[in-house]
Amino acid sequence: MSSIHDLDFIKEKLEELKKAGVYRKLTVLESPSGPRSIIDGKEVINLSSNNYLGLANHPRLKKAAIEAIEKWGVGAGAVRTIIGNMTIHEELERKLAEFKREEAVLTFQSGFTANMGVIQAVVDKGDVIISDELNHASIIDGCRLSRADVVIYKHSDMEDLERVLKEVKDKYRVKMIITDGVFSMDGDIAKLPEIVKLAEKYSAITYVDDAHASGVLGESGRGSADHFNLHGRIDIQIGTLSKAIGVVGGYVAGKRELIEWLNHRGRPFLFSTALPPAAVAASIEAINILSESDALTRKLWDNAKYFKEKLKSLGFDTGKSETPITPVIIGEETKALEFSRKLFEEGVFAQGIVYPTVPKNKARVRTIVTAAHTKEDLDAALKAFEKVGKQLNII
């Protein structure tokens, strides 16, 4: 006799994924994250990492992490509101606030939990969130948890955003516009100057998730607010320590009063053990490196421009990308996954992205070049893209 504990309903859902050709297993990395990585015993050019600046295996970050373990141990031992708040946590937040040119910063365990915690702490029932339709899943989940009404506007469509703002103008206590700074699947940049003007016109709060802009846009990677010279005009900025910074964690930057409030009402902050000392120390060292020089961000953009232009010249559809995130849009889901598999056979790891991560018929292979890639790496990858693209009649 079958039991509910057999989880037959889950097995059926897994079978549906397999029949649709979109079932996947986790890739196992057998080396540090870098421009070339070892997967299944094979060295491949890595075009799927968020390690934009190559800091994840940087000797200065590793040294800082090791020294922190020797001094502080491997864990904080408690939430920060009890006895897990170490001096290095405070130091990291000071460094981040200076780097972002904001009054204060509060760190979280990830960018995902930062979005979930901040949104639900800032808005509530009787408020409204106005969210771009392509915002990250963590924003979507944060909106759901907040109990506020949510209105979606068409992606980067300022006319539609203004239409929504007019509709909600006198209906809510707090109005908050939320957007990614850089959109993770298409690589386009939010129209922040226009969003800020509309927010000021209609008395709305602005909230920007800079996960893919931190370390990428602006002076030495200070983010999208710096990129557009909007310091002091964006109310809430979310950042991550897990991508360009090369470590793990997330943070929110803004006014001191905002950070004080989140100290009291940011649930993931309140109920999760503090970031481990090694991660904190490595993040501090990453900020030090970025503050000293813009060499890594310049190399990142040189590589991104070169790779994107070459892909376009081969005939690939790279959509509306403006950043080191460059999608190769295939359309059909099974074909995108096959494209990814064949690239791996040619020594290139570039992840196939399918529904529900992207809309149906918009499947793609998403590439991210880094500052650590050499021109030889990129040329070898381009050769593989050309070969597989012709095999599958994509170009």
From Swiss-Prot:
SUPFAM superfamilies: PLP-dependent transferases. Pfam families: Aminotran_1_2. Homodimer. It catalyses: 6-carboxyhexanoyl-[ACP] + L-alanine + H(+) = (8S)-8-amino-7-oxononanoate + holo-[ACP] + CO2. It comes from the Bacteria. This is 8-amino-7-oxononanoate synthase. Pyridoxal 5'-phosphate binds at G111, F112, S184, D209, D210, A211, H212, T240, L241, S242, K243. The keyword Transmembrane helix does not apply. Catalyzes the decarboxylative condensation of pimeloyl-[acyl-carrier protein] and L-alanine to produce 8-amino-7-oxononanoate (AON), [acyl-carrier protein], and carbon dioxide. Pathway: Cofactor biosynthesis; biotin biosynthesis. One of its GO terms (biological process) is biotin biosynthetic process. Belongs to the class-II pyridoxal-phosphate-dependent aminotransferase family. BioF subfamily. One of its GO terms (molecular function) is 8-amino-7-oxononanoate synthase activity. CDD domains: KBL_like (cd06454). Substrate binds at R24, H136, T357.
